Amino acid sequence: MTFRNCVAVDLGASSGRVMLARYERECRSLTLREIHRFNNGLHSQNGYVTWDVDSLESAIRLGLNKVCEEGIRIDSIGIDTWGVDFVLLDQQGQRVGLPVAYRDSRTNGLMAQAQQQLGKRDIYQRSGIQFLPFNTLYQLRALTEQQPELIPHIAHALLMPDYFSYRLTGKMNWEYTNATTTQLVNINSDDWDESLLAWSGANKAWFGRPTHPGNVIGHWICPQGNEIPVVAVASHDTASAVIASPLNGSRAAYLSSGTWSLMGFESQTPFTNDTALAANITNEGGAEGRYRVLKNIMGLWLLQRVLQEQQINDLPALISATQALPACRFIINPNDDRFINPETMCSEIQAACRETAQPIPESDAELARCIFDSLALLYADVLHELAQLRGEDFSQLYIVGGGCQNTLLNQLCADACGIRVIAGPVEASTLGNIGIQLMTLDELNNVDDFRQVVSTTANLTTFTPNPDSEIAHYVARIHSTRQTKELCA
């Protein structure tokens, strides 16, 4: 038997993990084992919301060392993280300033300023990326306006996964899928857009040309002295998750469900027309030249904050209590900027309901019900937008990532969208990370080949839409009201 041992470092906004994958060539089987899991979260430092990158690096090294201590020969390592955030380095490779997190308020007002000065359509035609107030484009503008004293010291700007790869290898890389999340990459050239960079205040010399997934960045020398290749995987965690989504046919959509929910479909060409701009659709880079045509949805961040504020440790019990409540009594827009990082999420949700003359969710279960119903309804709206954009309805939706374990939300999604939902795999980002490593090692041919492996090894659960559910009736009433308004307009 021929085995490959690949390590995936998968960092999310709330947790990180070092996972060992064992691939058996002859039977094309893939197994995952968790080596080390650790917390991640926001910190307050010198008036900024930041990431503790030193702690994350220590956790990564601890996980890698654990694998080596077991005497396992590692064939390759790959790192994926969330998008848009970056670390600044000087000429000696030392950090400049703080690793500020995207939920910091320093970018307030800058997106509107960019649209006014550069033109919303021009920015979109150049980048193909949706407008989010924390995109790297606006973060860099905030940095250069608010901390000009740092600029003379900056030699390099590395996005998060590239920074951690650099810390392991001493080699710098700017991986393409994550680079596209910055809103600074030109969608036609796949290189940094000089006009957008100029507006941001950043120097183009801070960046190298983006590289596509599948190249070896450098090598990590393990404690035993072996040189282990560090591969540039699809380093945006959503890009990795999409690679591991067992999409079947052209009418399949995906939903990567975690702190963020990212709903979309794969395409060989981007969508940058006026319809896409009006819907704020993004065209992020994927593996093999594919585009991830999708929309960001605030996701389970709202629930994570409620769990933290209310000190709730038993999520299954909360979901059970939530399931017993009637649907659609409290509806909010999860994508409202007010929910990006409020002082207290519970109060913000209650205020949003109060301002729209709805009942106020008071109990933990009512707050969770509000979040789940609101997310499912937003999923339905976004899926409809995506279908209109491409001119064809979807026949099935694949939900991947940690959020796919929430069976209540999966069923609500199926009912609200009126579509069959297939949930799994849970560790999609990790698997997609491993998939690119196996392709780089010449064990697999391409993404479609890898998806066949995922389909046969992952635990997948199907949720059939129930047209008689409360949320399905609610959606039907909304559609009827919309059609009446359109006819009367």
Swiss-Prot record:
Catalytic activity annotation: L-rhamnulose + ATP = L-rhamnulose 1-phosphate + ADP + H(+)
Domain of life: Bacteria
Transmembrane segments: none
Catalytic residue positions: D237
GO biological process, one term: rhamnose catabolic process
Pathway(s) annotated for this protein in UniProt: Carbohydrate degradation; L-rhamnose degradation; glycerone phosphate from L-rhamnose: step 2/3
Protein's name according to its UniProt entry: Rhamnulokinase
Organism: Escherichia coli O9:H4 (strain HS)
